[in-house]
Amino acid sequence: MEPNIALIASLIGDQARSKMLTALMCGKALTATELALEADITAQTASSHLTKLVEGELLVVRKQGRHKYFQLKDHQVAELLEQLLTLSAAHSSATNSSTTNLSTSGASLKQSTGPAD
């Protein structure tokens, strides 16, 4: 069976799921309710997302009494998320820098293209 990068990317790429995965980076196991709060979604929506993450083998679930606790499957998942967070932060910095440079050069352009006397 060939690796399916697109599947993993789509699982991580959803904003609610990425928030839940990021919340689990602390190493603790959290309930669906706790993860729903982290992702700012309903418990029902969180349950659907968590099922996808478990089926996609990014999370494991364990029962303790009547509660289910979710945690990252292993260190490889944590390392992948850490790399994506680093890449995302670098990309955000580069994008903000480019936007600032464009805004500054646009302001200079407006100043230098005034009407001729």
What are these regions (language model features)?
Residues 44, 51:
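Key DNA-contact positions within bacterial/archaeal DNA-binding proteins
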